[in-house]
Structures are given as C-alpha cells and as structure tokens.
UniProtKB/Swiss-Prot annotation:
Documented EC number(s): 2.4.1.-
Chief localization: membrane
Protein name: Glycosyltransferase 8 domain-containing protein 1
Taxonomic lineage from the root: Eukaryota, Metazoa, Chordata, Craniata, Vertebrata
Lumenal topological intervals: 29-371
Source species of the chain: Mus musculus (Mouse)
Gene of this entry: Glt8d1
Membrane topology qualifier: Single-pass type II membrane protein
Amino acid sequence: MSFRKVNIIIWVLAVVLFLLVLHHNFLSLSSLLKNDISDSGIVGLQPIDFVASAHQHPVSERQEEIPVVIAASEDRLGGTIAAINSVHQNTRSNVMFYIVTFNSTADHLRSWLNSGSLKSIRYKIVNFDTKLLEGKVKQDPDQGESMKPLTFARFYLPILVPSAKKAIYMDDDVIVQGDILALYNTPLKPGHAAAFSEDCDSASTKVIIRGAGNQYNYIGYLDYKKERIRKLSMKASTCSFNPGVFVANLTEWKRQNVTNQLEKWMKLNVEEGLYSRTLAGSITTPPLLIVFYQQHSTIDPMWNVRHLGSSAGKRYSPQFVKAAKLLHWNGHFKPWGRTASYADVWEKWYIPDPTGKFSLIRRHMDTSNIK
C-alpha cells in the first residue's frame, strides 16, 4: 500500500472520530438543555422552598395546591367573601382556601360559599381556638378591631395548615386583581420564613397618625424607651412592613419556631408594655417586626397596594388602582362601610349574602333614605 493511501485512510478515520465526538457532545448538550427547561418551569418565577443542592420548582397552573389563609369574622364576612371571589375569578391555579373562623360563624359562612359562583371553590373551614391567646393579649378598648382574636390567626399558620410547605396569608379587606400564582411564587431567600411588602416601597404612601409622625418605621410601632426593646439593637429608623398580606415558607417557619417567638413577645408586651403608645395599626405588627427584623424577603409592592381605608378620599389614580395586583383597604374606612374610597372597585367582587344577615351599610342607608 502506497504512503499516499495510508495518509488518506488516517485522514478519513480522524474525520469519522471527530464526527462521533461532535455527535456525542451534541446529544449531551441537548439532554442538559431539556433538563434545564423542565427544572425552570415558568420563566422568571422562583422556587417554593430553598433546599441546598436540590432542584427548585416554581408552581405552575393546576400543579401544586396553593393554600390561601384568610380570617372570617361574622361582622366582616362580606369582606372575606369578596376577597375569596376575587382570588377565584383571577386564577386557574389549584387554590385551597383555609378560612379561619369560629363555630358560631361556620354555618353562615358555609351557606354563603355554597351559593352562586363560589360553589366550585375548594375550601376548609378552620375553627380558631381563643385559648391560644390566653395570657398573650392585653385588653385595650382603644385598639378596637385590632384586638379581635381572629387578627392573630396569622401567627399560627403551621397549626392552621399543618401539611403545607408554603402558604399565603391575606386580610379580609383586600381585593386580588392579579393571578395569585404570581404571589405564591414570590422568591424567599434562604433562611427566610416569610416575605412582606415594606412600608417604604414605591407603591406605599406614608401615613400620618395621631401627631406621632410617619408610621412607616420601627419607632412607630415599638416603645424605644423600654430597655428590653433597646437591648435588641434594632434601628428605630428601620422600615416597617405590612403583615396584612404575606407569603410564608412554613418549613422554615417551623424550623425557626416563629410562632413560639411571636408568643414570647406577646407575653412580654402584656407584662411590660413594649408597643408604641401611639400605635394606630394592628397590634399584630410589633411582634412580627421584632421576630422578622432584617430576616424577611419582600413581595412585589403591587401585591399590597394599601391605605385605601385610611381615609374616604382617593389617594391613587384610577390607572394605578387598575394596575395594582392586590388592593388593601387597611384603616377605618372599609369598603363595606358607610364611606370608603374605591368602593365601586371592591363591590364588583362582592356577592350578596343569601341569608340576608350581612348587608352593605351604605346601600342600606341609601334604601332607608329613599323610603
């Protein structure tokens, strides 16, 4: 065999070997890309829980159950119904509502839920045991609504939804305009048990209360004259957050014994009066601020556009209200009351009580005036 033929054979074998290696690498890359796509799920969304060296999966429509916890007080039941309806109508996800109430309200609530457009929702009615609060809450007539037992349901999420790894909590004075799936997929940093909307965010406005200045930082909620508070070395100017809407990593919540920590500060407040004397917001906020100081993630501010109930006037433009993912009527002017801002927006989601026990106050007043 001539030297020329040997060179040709060697060259052909080299080309074949190169093509085989290239083909193998292409198959490996294709497999890797396929795995990456399946692990990523919905673009831009983050995992439920952080687990070191493990794949992380955001929830997609109709995949994993999304637990939504909301309280149902007899005198505010219309708010709960409107909030649930707004969530239900704006998502195709597998939502399970955990509605926290008392046995005395359960039948009324059930009859409302089983009528009309809410027949198809999935829900569980959970009775709240007030014994949980014994020795932890100091009765103060000036606090009004914030002293009601169901206000503290948010502290006991692992008890209310024991099998869930993650959950959303929301107050009864909200309307959801976005897909709750997006809120549920809020990314929580490693070691964080909850994500809140901070009061200094761009979608919030600073509220003036009782001459105490702007209640958007820690000094507006805690009494920094008390030694126990000072010993915590928390900056008084730290931005506070709103606990009316939040996402909780319940695995991390349990690991850190968050409920026990909250109860500890509730008891200490009863004994020592640690909360600010000018406190205008919910008394659930101070213990949460202490426990989650610099240890919480944040939700998109458009998922808690608040202060709609701070006054009867309109503080936001119609365009901004329409763009909001969640509207929050925190404050004294509730959308089912005599006067409220953007009541027409809230009323789109309200379903009249089939039993007639609950009625909108302003509508009742209008009827009385006509008569």
